[in-house]
Amino acid sequence: MQLILLSGGSGKRLWPLSNDARSKQFLPLLASPNGGMESMIQRVVRQIREAKLTDNITFATNAVQRDSIINQLGEDVNVVTEPERRDTFPAIALASSYLAKEQKCNDDEVVVIMPCDVYTESKYFATIAKMVEAVENNVADLVLMGITPTYPSEKFGYVVPESVSSKESVKSATSVFNNDCLRVARFTEKPNEEKAKELLKQNAFWNGGVFAFRLGYMMNIVNQYIQTETFQETHKRYTEFPKISFDYEVAEKAESVAVVPFTGEWKDLGTWNALCEELPSTHIGNVMMGDNNENTHAVNELGIPVFCNGLKDVIVAASPDGIMVCDKQDSEKIKDYANKLTTRPMYEERRWGTYRVLDNVEYEDGTRSLTKTIHLNAGKNISYQLHHHRSEVWTCVEGEGIFVLDGERKDVKRGDVMNIPIGHLHAIKATTDLTFIEVQIGNPLVEEDIERFDFEW
């Protein structure tokens, strides 16, 4: 079985911790079994492995999130990067092409699609195993997971099973199919509250965005748009796929569709209010909480302390991107305000580690300076590169590494300073965990001002 995890999102609903470069699934805010903290994406992959579902995990993502996935999960997962952000159908089509043409998977192999940021329990993954079994037994071409609703939500699409109007008939209809599978009658997009109540009376399920099918089934659909011999060709012609969701392009057009019900813990931690319910503590980071706070949470990623006192139903979040103080009931509005911000992300994860912007200044003559603290994980390196519009000064503050400037190597340690003129090739590799301060001077100071010559050395 092959598992494709979808990783996307713009990262605005949990601002200031999330941003365009760090979506919610990468925030290490959940309690880990080892006593530390883990992100949503780390939690889901851990649960998949604990359930022994499969070792064959492929991420379908965009270029911005690729490095974060590798940084948090290592090299044990495959990552398929779409050339541009489109929608779930082209992303799934590209990942399926990767399995078929790059990994040489058989057409009969079962593929499961699921989101990477779901907050759920072990029964969820047992339900996925039932979906796989249903596909293997040819119950339907496409099998979905149906989440048993807990209230008439307007936030989710619904899956309506065929000829089911009571709990008894659900049980009766189940016996027709393998492992609690029900035939799907129709799909309904996000309804208003009254329509949602009617759907619940029809025993409809929330569409949880989990699909199972044979690889050959999906490749037949892919070939309707792009027929190539190699994955690289498909990747180059990616824009020929329609910009449309998998639900619209595949699920709603499928002639043979079944749904496997799931009843259990299932949450979208995409709002501050929902996330606070699962935080392991009322405060994370350098936070001091007074004695008279009520239902208040604080998360601080800055080095300076945050003190909370006399607050009720409030969320306080501080990061290099900004500071938010918000009533919990109004926390869903934060995305509207975050969308108005035009500043660059101040914190990013890369395949080699992380960086944080400390200062960004423009001087009277138009020259700019940008100061970062950069952390390289032991054994990792940044690419051999040059810049056309800026010089850089690096100051090593922790650890040891190997610095290269125009082909000349030298060992560096805490206290060493490295000057990099405009247009000169340079790189650094961490012998141990390595932290250095980078000061860029020039104009413009943008991430795109980089010409890479070698990624690994």
Q: Could you tell me what each predicted segment is?
A:
Residues I41, A95, D117, V159, ...:
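Residue-level signal for inorganic ion chemistry
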Residues F213-M418, H424-A430, L445, E451-E456:
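Left-handed beta-helix
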Residues G11-P16, S23, E447:
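Short N-terminal binding/cap micro-motifs at the start of the first secondary-structure element
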Residues L6, M114, C396, V439:
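Catalytic metal- and UDP-sugar-binding loop of GT-A-like glycosyltransferases, i.e.
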Residues I437-L445:
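C-terminal structural segments of small proteins and small subunits
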Residues Q2-L5, W15-D20, P28-P115, Y119-A126, ...:
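Conserved N-terminal catalytic core of the sugar/cofactor nucleotidyltransferase
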Residues E121-Y238, A258:
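Conserved core of the sugar-phosphate nucleotidyltransferase
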